[in-house]
Design a protein with these regions (language model features):
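Conserved ABC ATPase signature
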Residues: 129-133
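Conserved ABC transporter NBD signature motif
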Residues: 56-74
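Q-loop/switch helix immediately C-terminal to the Walker
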Residues: 82, 88-101
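Helix-to-loop junction immediately C-terminal to a conserved catalytic motif
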Residues: 52
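Conserved ABC ATPase "signature" region
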Residues: 96, 100, 108-125
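Walker A (P-loop) phosphate-binding loop of ABC-type ATPase nucleotide-binding domains
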Residues: 39-43
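A short, flexible loop at the N-terminus of ABC-type nucleotide-binding domains that lies
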Residues: 1-5, 9-24, 30
């Protein structure tokens, strides 16, 4: 499998100023685990948000092995840095929400969510609101999110 980003550009407007977060960015990744390093404002979060479909790009192409612009989303998992979860969701509902975003079949969604939470030792807390979780529990929920995609 290969994820290819070619000529990715994304800019933001703040007041009257326009700033490029990414300009003609190109990268090819093969199967594996990767991390992004860079100074503040280098475009790391913008890049991840573009790859995962959270935000759009101004220009450029994204392809995954077969050339389909969006097929890679089902193969991609990530753990967000800020851990900004929906505090009023239960852990199980949050994982089911991520599954729905990733277009998982709703059949057996409860069972799959509970199994995934069990992998990170949160099955017993599946019906607790995320707002009541400790920092470590939120980290494990982030890992469960990455497992789902």
């Amino acid at each position: 499998m290969e994820l290819k980003l070619e000529g990715i550009t994304k800019s933001y407007t703040k007041g009257k100023k326009r700033k490029n977060a990414l300009e003609d960015f190109t990268l090819t990744l093969t199967e594996g685990v990767y991390g992004l390093l860079g100074s503040n404002g280098a475009g790391k979060s913008t890049l991840i948000n573009i790859i995962t479909g959270i935000i759009g790009r101004d220009s450029g192409n994204i392809s995954f092995t077969d050339g389909n612009d969006n097929s890679f989303l089902s193969h991609l998992g990530f753990m967000p840095q800020g851990m900004d979860f929906y505090r009023n969701f239960t852990a199980k509902d949050y994982i089911k929400y991520i599954m729905a975003l990733k277009k998982y079949s709703p059949d057996n969604a409860d069972e799959y969510a509970l199994t995934t939470l069990g992998k990170v030792n949160l099955r017993a807390d599946a019906d607790k609101k995320i707002g009541a979780f400790s920092g470590g529990m939120k980290q494990r929920l982030g890992i469960a999110q990455a497992i789902v995609g």
